[in-house]
Structures are given as structure tokens and as C-alpha cells.
Amino acid sequence: APVDEKNPQAVALGYVSDAAKADKAKYKQFVAGSHCGNCALFQGKATDAVGGCPLFAGKQVANKGWCSAWAKKA
């Protein structure tokens, strides 16, 4: 199941299913071009539309999504 943006955990992390809608004023660490699909936490392939994330157990995040825990994939 996809992560609901209104889920308390999602709200706390500023999760959005479309990185273009990330609150860049609130999250100064936002990096242009960052999204779930190129995050170290993303548990899918770079080509998958959705994938697992350890921050949202049992849920799937959008590849093009974003949250404040984003960390560049090595």
C-alpha cells in the first residue's frame, strides 16, 4: 500500500509523493533532483514506480517522492 501523505509519520518527515511539491521553505536541506528513487533508503530498483522504505514499514513510497530523511544513494 502507498504511504498516505496525511499519515503522522509522513507528516513528521515532510513526505510527499511528488518531490516537486516538497516544502522547500521548511526543508532547507532539499537538494534539487533528490527523490525517493535515488535515496539510500529506497528498497526498490531505480526504475520501479514505488518501493519499500524502512521509515514506513509495510508501505511503499513513490519513486518520485521525497522526505526530509533523504540521503544520496552511494
Curated annotation (Swiss-Prot):
Residues at which [4Fe-4S] cluster binds: 36, 39, 53, 67
Paired cysteines (S-S): none
Secreted listed as a keyword: no
Gene3D superfamilies the UniProt entry points to: High potential iron-sulphur protein
The entry's keywords: 4Fe-4S, Electron transport, Iron, Iron-sulfur, Metal-binding, Transport
Cited Pfam families: HIPIP
Listed InterPro entries: High_potential_FeS_prot (IPR000170), HIPIP_sf (IPR036369)
Gene Ontology annotations of biological process type: aerobic electron transport chain
Family named by the database record: Belongs to the high-potential iron-sulfur protein (HiPIP) family.
Function, in words: Specific class of high-redox-potential 4Fe-4S ferredoxins. Functions in anaerobic electron transport in most purple and in some other photosynthetic bacteria and in at least one genus (Paracoccus) of halophilic, denitrifying bacteria.
The protein's name: High-potential iron-sulfur protein
Taxonomic source organism: Rubrivivax gelatinosus (Rhodocyclus gelatinosus)
